[in-house]
Amino acid sequence: MSFCVYGTDVALCNNEHVVIHNIENGAENTIRLPDLQTEKKIDSHNNANIESFHAITNVTFSNDGKYFFVCTNRKQLCLYERKNRNLLSNRTLARAASKVQFTRSNDIVVADKAGDAYLFSSSRSDRGILLLGHLSMMLDVLVTENEKYIITTDRDEKIRVSMFPNSYNIVSYCLGHTKFVTNILELPHDKTVLVSCGGDGVFILWDYEIGKELLSVDFCNKIPKRDIEKFNQQLQDYHLDESVEILPVKHLRLSALDGTSSLAVMSFYNNSLLLVYIISGTVKLQFEITYVQSIVIDDEPLECHLYKDNLWVLSELGFKVYEFKENNFIPNDKINCKLSQLNNLWKTLRNDSIKQNLFPILYKRKYDNVQEYLERKKTRLANITE
């Protein structure tokens, strides 16, 4: 499930439809995704599956609001014009995407679950260009605002900085995380700095061009122990042997406050908590990260966005918007009173949506066949002795 905001437009999606709702005048446009285009032969038993079970995993407006793309778990990537809703391209990806982003020039970069990153043009409908590959599943991808570098993360704790688009030239590695890295973003008030977080309970500031860690902040003590115990139980339910001491970060959102400070908001998998921090300072000045508040909503945030000092949160219960005022997020009653139509729409879409639990793929299953081998050996030796 995904949504995005630009101006007064809110794009909301479920399995097969995107609805763009204008919160000022209440206008709605519903777009049904086109059929999947593929040259590969699909077996009949899988064909029905593809058309009946496909969920939109990402819908995003470009930075200038000219375009938006829709990406689904059936490897479909569609690009539209925002104003007239025209379909510009309908592509089939090589593999399912794990993260999709616009570049500053409105091209699209896709990181997939096999560890590859592709670049797709917004002006041409040709096939994507393979940029680079990891040996592990990619979890996030970022093309810097100056379009000089592409930064990628994976499930094996690595952050790789490469030249863009000639990504065979590796600039540096940012090594410091001890678990998978789910989110990377440029610091809004100082684009030479990278902010990262994931499954190890810290978020780190980097001088990414040289792979140097500038500051690391631990947020483990902000998570209630009962929430961690509940999460560990869910890991066991998925037959994962791992036990964690911190919740993995689901979303990291940043927004500039002024020329020397930015807001940071984190949400977590299977938890209703949002943590808010202020990052102040620059590379030339000393960085400082200050805890601001914890926001507890009624359910796990399915998606959240920072847009013009407003925090938009979507949960199973609908949308809620907070405004940053006097160093705290408080409910934005001016916008929330306009969301009744949007929330009614969400209730309809929610009933048709396919629920997905994505966090289990972040943790690796451990297979121990040594004990089984020893038991077989013991039995074999016993038979020989007899």
Predicted regions and their residues:
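Beta-propeller domains
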Residues: 11-42, 75-78
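Short C-terminal beta-strands that terminate individual repeats in beta-propeller domains
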Residues: 30-33, 47-50, 88-93, 128-133, ...
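Hydrophobic beta-strand positions that form the internal "hydrophobic ladder"
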Residues: 10, 68, 108, 150, ...
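Short loop/turn segments that connect beta-strands within beta-propeller blades
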Residues: 24, 82-85, 122-125, 164-167, ...
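Canonical WD40 repeat/beta-propeller blade segments in eukaryotic WD-repeat proteins
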Residues: 1-3, 47-61, 95-102, 136-143, ...
